[in-house]
Amino acid sequence: MKIAVLSRNPRLYSTRRLVEAGIERGHEMVVIDTLRAYMNIASHKPQIHYRGKPLEGFDAVIPRIGASVTFYGCAVLRQFEMMGVFPLNESVAIARSRDKLRSLQLLSRRGIGLPVTGFAHSPDDIPDLIQMVNGAPLVIKVLEGTQGIGVVLCETATAAESVIEAFMGLKQDIMVQEYIKEAGGADIRCFVVGDKVIASMKRQAKPGEFRSNLHRGGSASLIKITPEERMTALRAAKVMGLSVAGVDILRSNHGPLVMEVNSSPGLEGIEVTTSKDVAGMIIEYLEKNSGPHMTRTKGKG
């Protein structure tokens, strides 16, 4: 197979591993800088050009689209789909997952466990918003944030009001969530490929920190997930329409709660922690499922 990897940086661990795994299994792997691909949206003959030449003959495409280039990246991926190239994750599902609020709305409609979450526009509604998520302590999240950036833990209602007012004053969209104290600064990353959770790890925040992201100095360890956690991760990925996803789950007193569904989960943390060939499993999924004109929109957006 000829497989494209949409990635800004061929030296990133995840990109390198996917290329290695593909070559090991006998495929031709081509890394394409997402922002250097440009499109000819012609009737009956959609094309993508790259460094002066049309891209042709691809069987599958693996999108590794960073949050900052979501709009353009999804447009390039959509053009691949129009050309009949099989996407590991579809453009519509990636766009859906990048909108944190929409993601939670879709998951809640399907009855998947979530932390109580509030969203408001007017400063007049802040006191009621805080009550809605069971008061302080609570967590405030910027909707566009990634890797734990733009996430604030407010210990008191007064602090929460000040922070929410500040964000609103900056015209920054935020959501407010209940703080799950019993999780103890830890979450579980379940790595979903197809209809299986192929690997999972526990991420623990460093002392004095509540964000467990590895980019924020959190540590990762092996964990055995429960059948309920496994089912929650699979259902969350399915609702989002993602074939490959990193589903972040908190262990609460009332069962597993989904924090986020990541459409471009990093491979380094999960491979190093579990010693599993996750990249190889992703390529294997493409071998089994890809075919010309197999793009079908999944999920219920």
Swiss-Prot record:
Binds 2 magnesium or manganese ions per subunit. ATP binds at K141, E178, Y179, D187, R211, S212, N213. GO terms for cellular component: cytoplasm. Mn(2+) 2 binds at E260, N262. Residues 104-287 form the ATP-grasp domain. Gene3D superfamilies: 3.40.50.20, ATP-grasp fold, A domain (3.30.1490.20), ATP-grasp fold, B domain (3.30.470.20). Mg(2+) 2 binds at E260, N262. SUPFAM superfamilies: Glutathione synthetase ATP-binding domain-like. Mg(2+) 1 binds at D248, E260. Keywords: ATP-binding, Ligase, Magnesium, Manganese, Metal-binding, Nucleotide-binding, Protein biosynthesis. GO terms for biological process: protein modification process; SOS response; translation. InterPro entries: ATP-grasp, ATP-grasp_RimK-type, ATP_grasp_subdomain_1, RimK, Rimk_N, Rp_bS6_RimK/Lys_biosynth_LsyX. It is an enzyme of class 6 (ligase). Its cofactor is Mg(2+); Mn(2+). Belongs to the RimK family. This is Probable alpha-L-glutamate ligase. It comes from Pseudomonas syringae pv. tomato (strain ATCC BAA-871 / DC3000).
